[in-house]
Amino acid sequence: MLPMFKRIALLVVAGAALSGVPGDAQAGGYYRQYYTSWSYYSTTRYYYRTYYYYPTTVSTTYSYHYCIYYPSQPRYVYYYNPVSQQYWGRFEFGEDGKPKGYSLLAEKDRKEKLADIPESAFPKPAAMPAIPGTNDNEKMEAPPADLPPKDLPKG
């Protein structure tokens, strides 16, 4: 009886481990880039998700940036580079929740604090930029349209 229990426990653990891996990766696929689900950061009262990517096709370790959503600015998802510690652009959604495009900040306009970036520094939304550090000009995937609620969690 114990060996059967151990086999069931092993299957449950393996299933739980695989459930955290994206679908194609479960089948031995390759993900050049992907976004995690949203998390809430109560100290600064914003939501964030991580954008993981391989800078090159031969990279073996993911790099990442943060996507930050402020409920007070519900149309935008801001991209933050944790290495340079700067906001470098934002993705805009329309009032209807449909994607409008990406605004890539000029190098001179990238700042550590969003409050230090004037609204006028953001260009009109356009196509997604290349994956950061890429040598093949592969474009970033747009963020999923599953924006967090506009109302902050209680507590």
Per-range role (PLM):
Residues 1-28, 121-155:
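Classical secretory targeting signals
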Residues 29-118:
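Low-complexity segments
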